[in-house]
Amino acid sequence: MKVKLADKHGFCFGVKRAIKLAESHQGGITLGPLIHNKKEIERLKNDFGVTVEESVENLPRGSEVIIRTHGIPKDDLAKLTQSAEKIIDATCPFVTKPQKICEIMSQEGYQIIIFGDINHPEVQGVMSYSSSEPIVVMSPKELFGAKLKEKVALVSQTTKKIEDFLGVASFLVQRCAEVRIFNTICNATFDNQEAARHLSQEVDIMIIAGGKNSSNTKQLLSICLEHCQDSYLIEDESELDPQWFTNKKTCGVTAGASTPEWIIERVVRTIEGYKG
């Protein structure tokens, strides 16, 4: 089986930075999973003794705490400063951008609109920086009936599709007197999506490697399905099904921003061993 790897794929700058920080603080505790990839979280635990704690209240006093790439709510950060021995901030710089924007714009009287998943830890963190209650939506439809103010500021979860973000922006521009639009979608996310979009039009089957709880990985699957019906999301090579590749000649492979290279290499090697 011939395999084509997307030009842009895998670990982004923010994830690489976070992994290095975790590896250099052996025995540290991350507040929530550092990244959305179970296999890499297991590796950090086994090789570096880095464990995960979901709640600030359950952290042992005097701990060395690593803040996840997605950031944490403002209140949790305040609690950490009181209880942790040391705080290692692995929040992706692209995530701190919408946090700061929400803080500043809400203080200036703008109503904050966040395009993203309200249940995602990144969005929950960003929400906490707004001094007034923000509106969080996944589509323009969710804004129908919302009490929009004359002045609004729009930001996006960093891993969303630009087309969907622009749809929300267009809705607001047509209904509000003043709209401040901040494109907070990460450059690496955009590049990975574009590479996946192009590759999925050139192959018979697409494999997307990444955590099934990863927002950016699910976006890659959505994009690939637009152009290649035989697109599959897997966490590692063990989830590959040889029957998927029957009568296929070329397979495209991409990976989410939290997918380590060692998983990608195993996936590619396994697929190369299949007969179409």
Curated annotation (Swiss-Prot):
The active site is at residue 122. Keywords: 4Fe-4S, Iron, Iron-sulfur, Isoprene biosynthesis, Metal-binding, Oxidoreductase. It is an enzyme of class 1 (oxidoreductase). Pfam families: LYTB (PF02401). CDD domains: lytB_ispH (cd13944). GO terms for biological process: dimethylallyl diphosphate biosynthetic process; isopentenyl diphosphate biosynthetic process, methylerythritol 4-phosphate pathway; terpenoid biosynthetic process. It comes from the Bacteria. Dimethylallyl diphosphate binds at residues 36, 70, 120, 214-216, 258. Pathway: Isoprenoid biosynthesis; dimethylallyl diphosphate biosynthesis; dimethylallyl diphosphate from (2E)-4-hydroxy-3-methylbutenyl diphosphate: step 1/1; Isoprenoid biosynthesis; isopentenyl diphosphate biosynthesis via DXP pathway; isopentenyl diphosphate from 1-deoxy-D-xylulose 5-phosphate: step 6/6. Belongs to the IspH family. Catalyzes the conversion of 1-hydroxy-2-methyl-2-(E)-butenyl 4-diphosphate (HMBPP) into a mixture of isopentenyl diphosphate (IPP) and dimethylallyl diphosphate (DMAPP). Acts in the terminal step of the DOXP/MEP pathway for isoprenoid precursor biosynthesis. This is 4-hydroxy-3-methylbut-2-enyl diphosphate reductase.
